[in-house]
C-alpha cells in the first residue's frame, strides 16, 4: 500500500474545528470610531451656517470657522461599550490641554472647544462635588454661577502636568478662569450613533435639497456620497484642501443630484434658476423645399 509522508498528511488533512481568530488582530472598534467621527463631520457640513467654513483634521477632528472670525474646535470620541466620559478621561484631558495651547492660554478670545461623544457622563473617582454632581455636570453649573473652587480643585488633581495645570495652580481670578476656560467649553455627550446618527444626516440632506429645490426623496441615496466626500477631503495631505464651505455643499448636491442629464429623475421639481419657454427659435431655412426637390429630381 502507498504511505503518505508526514508533511503530505498535514497538507491534505482538514481542520477538525473552525479556525480561531485572534481578537487582538481585529480593529472593528477603531473602524467604528472613525466612522462615528466622519459622520459627525458630515453632519457639521450639512449644518454649516452661511459664511462659515468646516476644517477637517486641522486643530481637532474638525473645526468650524465662524463668519465673525471665531474658531470652534471639535474633538469627537466614540465608544462601542459602556464607557463614560469624565474630566479624568484621557480624551477630555487631552482636548482641554490642546484647547489651551491653541487658544494661547485663552488669550485668543474667539477660540472655543466642543467635546462631542456618544458616551454618557460618568463620575470621577475619589472626588466629591457639591450635590454629588459629576465633574461635567458641575462644569455646567459653574457656567450658571456656581462656586468655581471645587471645579478648580478637581481639574488640578486630574489634568496632566503642563501649562494649563500650572496656570490653575497659580490661583488666577475666578472671572478670568471662567472667561478663558469654563465658558469656552461645551460638552456634547450621549450623541446618537449608528442608525439614529444616519437618520440625522439624511434629514439634514433632505432639508438642504428642499432649499435648493431638488427632490428631498434623493436624500437616502446621497448619504453615502456625502460620507465619501468627507473621507476624500479628510485624506488630503495639503491642509489647505481640508476645508469645506456651504457653497461647496450646494455645488456638490447639485452635481450628485443631476447625474444623467438631461431629463433628471421622475417627479423632478423645477429649480429656481430654470426659465420656462413657450417656443424655441429655430434657424431659418437655407432653401425652399420645392426648389430643393426640383433640383434633386433633375440631377
Language-model-detected regions and their locations in the chain:
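Catalytic centers of nucleases
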Residues: 23-26, 30-101
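Acidic metal-coordinating catalytic centers involved in nucleic-acid phosphodiester chemistry
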Residues: 1-30, 78-299
